[in-house]
Swiss-Prot record:
Cellular component per GO, a single term: extracellular region
Main location group: secreted
Family to which the UniProt record says this protein belongs: Belongs to the periviscerokinin family.
Protein name: Periviscerokinin-1
Lineage, broadest ranks: Eukaryota, Metazoa, Ecdysozoa, Arthropoda, Hexapoda
Organism: Periplaneta americana (American cockroach)
Keyword Membrane in annotation: no
UniProt keyword list: Amidation, Neuropeptide, Secreted
Residues with the Asparagine amide modification: N11
GO BP: neuropeptide signaling pathway
Transmembrane segments: none
Superkingdom in the source lineage: Eukaryota
Function: Myoactive peptide; has excitatory actions on the hyperneural muscle.
Length: 11
């Protein structure tokens, strides 16, 4: 979700 910016939100 965070386009890879946040490790747990790599969606």
């Amino acid at each position: 979700g965070a386009s890879g910016l946040i490790p747990v939100m790599r969606n």
